[in-house]
Every structure is written in C-alpha cells, then in structure tokens.
Amino acid sequence: MVLVKKANGKWRMCVDFTDMNKACPKDSYPLPNIDALVDSASGCKMLRVLDAFSGYNQIKMHPRDESKMAFMTETCSYCYKVMPFGLKNAGATYQRLMEKVLAPMLGRNVQAYVDDMVVTSHERR
C-alpha cells in the first residue's frame, strides 16, 4: 500500500493489484468513442460536464470477492467493501453500470464516459 498525492492536494491510498489483475480475465466491455462523444455535443446551446464524486467507491464489492481485495499494513489486515481504484476491469464495470443507470437518457441529452457525464441541450431554458 502506498499513499499518492492527488492534484487537489488530497491523498489517495493505492494498493498494488498487479497479481490480481494478471489472474483476472479482461472484461472487454467497450468504452464509448470519445471523438463521437465530443462531436455529439457540437451545436448544443448548453453543455455541462459532471464528474462522479468518488464514483468507484459507490460500487459495492460482492461479499464473496471482498477477501480477494485484502491487503496488509504493519498493524492489521483490511479488505475493500467497495470497488478499489486500480483493478483492471474497474473502468468496464463502471461504464456498464453507468449505461444501465442512465439508459433512458443516453444518446438523447446525456453521454457517459466512465465516471464523467456530459449533459447537453439544444435549447436554452
């Protein structure tokens, strides 16, 4: 485990999941084409980009998988109850869930790219 300073000055705890990532099959769920996402916003009168706050920490781990995410410090062992940052398939998992949650709006006035959402409108109200 290491602490990494983020751009905003806060700290992020990182665990090295290299071995776990090697053991897991890749989830090939496709991410949206970023160029198409940008193109879809052209000509809009209003545009908002939203970043999900601690988005990965909103996704609960399945209880049977919590022990697989265990790590040790000098004093104790811990396991994640939410999806940790650094897992190979975290982005695909997040994208899949965002598309499920936002399904009624996707392609109309909302686009999702992992933990970022673009909300557009052709009208100004």
Question: What kind of feature is each model-predicted range?
Answer:
Residues 1-125:
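Retroelement reverse transcriptase polymerase core
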